[in-house]
C-alpha cells in the first residue's frame, strides 16, 4: 500500500485510459485532458478499459513515480462521468486499493462464535 498523507489531494481521471501509457503519456494526459499540473504533488489515478487495473502518478518533489495495481478478481469502482476528474480523499483511495467500493465502504468481516 502506498503511504498517502491524509491531506493529499487525489484525482480520479474519469473515463477510460490506455493503461499501456507510461509516466510521460500519463503526465501529458493530466496536463491536456484534466487541465492540471502533474508536478504539484497531487496523486492522479487512472483506470484501464477492463477496470481491473489502475495506475497512480505522483510527483514527490524529487521525481515522478508510477504505481500500478491489478485486481485478481472484480473491478475497481469508478465514476460514471466520461471526461474530467473527480477528487477523492486519501481514505477513499485506500478503500479503492483494497478493492472496496470507496463511495459506500461496508465492513464485511463478521467474527465467528467460539464453541
What is each residue range found by the language model?
Residues 1-115:
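Polybasic/polar functional segments that serve as interface/processing modules
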